[in-house]
Amino acid sequence: SDKPLERINYIPYAGAIEMITLSSFVEYIKANVDVMADKMIVHVVSPTEVRLYSALDADRKREYLVNVRAGLPDFRFGSFIDHENFVIALQSKFAPNEDRDLVLKFAGTVEDGTVAQYGDDGVTQKATVKTGLASKADAVVPNPVTLIPYRTFLEVQQPASDFIFRMKSANGVQCAIFEADGGAWKNEAMDNIKEYLKNELTDLKQFTVIS
């Protein structure tokens, strides 16, 4: 034949199930509702994705059974957003800690049109904040700050990392936070996911967890 031939695959493969939590993934495995290969691979792909594969079969192929993508709130790091939405996002999309409360307090009392830059480093800022019903004072914008955004599966500990907090006056006060840890949080998050799954599946020896 002058056309490429392909071997007919007699082994049917299931389509991947979509999930959004690690707990539902563990429940699915422990329920033993589907027949699986003797050896299975749980692959932690990223801080927001886990996949379940079979080991290689006779045709050197893997069955892709489950895809878990974390259902997380969205936050635009590195982008200035208006003051009110920033405060709401900080309260709803970040775990409480001392620095979060500090940023919230500062952002909640700053006056429009008073954000000013000073010094030679181009990083430090100051602004006028309300210190009482009728009193005001200049204050330094806190930097850097350690925050804990919800950015991996909620079943595991959320990594804390450093951020640069910036403000500007443009159609009202606008705020932004910029990641300052070089992405190191991703490795910590993936390690946390791996440990969680290893602990949950410790009695099921056919499952190997990798990242």
Protein language model annotation of sequence segments:
Residues 76-126:
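Membrane-inserting effector segments that mediate pore formation, membrane fusion
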Residues 1-53, 204-211:
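An N-terminally focused, membrane-permeabilizing/fusogenic/translocator signature enriched
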